[in-house]
Amino acid sequence: MKKRILSILLVAALAAGTLFGCGSVKEETNETTKTIEEGAADAKTASNADSITNTEPVEITIAYPSDDGAEEKLNTLIEEFNKSYPNIKVNYELIPFSSWPDYITKLKTMVAGGTGPDVARLAVEGIQSFVADGMALPFDDFIAENADLMEELGVNDIHPNINAPFQIDGKTYGFAWDWNNIVMFLNKDVFAEKNIELPSADWDKDKFLEIAQALTYEKDGEKVYGTVAPTDYFTVTAWLYNNNASVLNEDMTKCTLNSPEAIETIQFLYDLVYKYGVAPSPSAGLDTSNLFMNGQIAMLGNGRWSIASLANNNFEDYDIQALPALSTRQSAFGSGSFPVLSSTKHPYEAMLFSSWLSASSFSQETFLKTDSVPSRISVMEKILPTMLPENGMLWRESADVAKSIQAPKQLTDVTAVFDKYMSLIFANEISVEDGMNKATEEIDAILAE
């Protein structure tokens, strides 16, 4: 695994220190909590670099998914962080990324092997699991001892609803940096070619289907599809929420995919392909983003993360709208943060770096301008009205009412079962009802373990 060591300190000499802890993660929790308290006592608010410039230099490491541009992003962030906190040397380790469940498994393997990082990039998909396994430290003492710093960094400006997934059993395990929800991306050229108006916020299933059918046609020997039928956990959850359904019950102890509302939702998505013919058959090689930009897909459910690709391809003829209501209107979201692992030897410095990453104006405005949605209210209201899409403030509005996706500690196994049966359904190897019944049985067994 590739490990990049950065040397961006503004001090003359560095003291070498132990980077990783050994032994049981749970056994070290009390000791690291003690260290936090001691660090807080030594540097009460750390509201600027002067408060820690007299302390010994320390090294911490952050684990981050190896997505495009991750290395350049981290280099820039750490360099800026060290302008205020030169005595904290930050290294990073890039972890190959294919999905959140896969990334979480790799990260836990590192921790179990004694090579875990101090800070980790983690989404809502993983925080419950890390907390349940005793691998994440609560920030509550750090927050209480550093009220001025929280205000200075902008932590208090983070939208409380977006930050809620990182507050578990009355404790805070980091601050949300970014978030996404699924909205409908609309290819304005395709709409204009068929002289169809973009949908309004109050559209429903019938209006959606009417538009999708009108925008499905042949052009220059190529099929243009009105929309896409999603099969992934995150996007399907958004559709389930819009029909008063969900993968799990409220306390995430039982699967509810066999409910009439859930079966109705999955059947509707299936019918988009096989009954109405307005969506292509899902396949591993289906590049929906390029098809959307090429005008072969008119409406595509996606998150704000996709606007970077649209901008890189100079594609501007698009807008967004909330997903159509099925029986209700409910937005589903997922957020990401930088939890501190309980195996860290430097919890105070790790929490300081994590808080800066999540909330600082530099971090939010520099790297979330053309990426995920910023978590800070003021940054959303500053950035979204100035950029494409025109209806971008929809993200700010939905932050108030969006509901987090369900991410139990067994999420990796739950999504594996979910993906398996969605694949079987869309391959016509099992009916929607039978698939959802079997998925429910298997997921219930996982949750009961």
Show the residue positions of the predicted features.
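Conserved C-terminal helix/tail region of periplasmic/extracytoplasmic solute-binding proteins
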Residues: 42-46, 192, 198, 271-274, ...
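Extracytoplasmic/periplasmic substrate-recognition and gating elements
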Residues: 83, 89, 113, 194, ...
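Hinge/lid segment of periplasmic solute-binding proteins
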Residues: 39, 43-52, 124-181, 319-321, ...
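Extracytoplasmic "Venus flytrap"/periplasmic binding protein-like
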Residues: 80, 84-157, 193-195, 291, ...
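Long, aromatic- and glycine/proline-rich binding clefts that accommodate carbohydrate-like moieties
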Residues: 156-157, 368-420, 424
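Short, low-complexity disordered leader/linker segments with a strong preference
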Residues: 1-61, 83, 382, 386-390, ...
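Short, solvent-exposed loop/beta-turn-alpha elements that line the ligand-binding surface or hinge
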Residues: 140-158, 200-201, 218-221, 225-226, ...
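Glycine-centered hinge/linker elements that transmit conformational signals in sensory
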Residues: 209-214, 251-282, 323
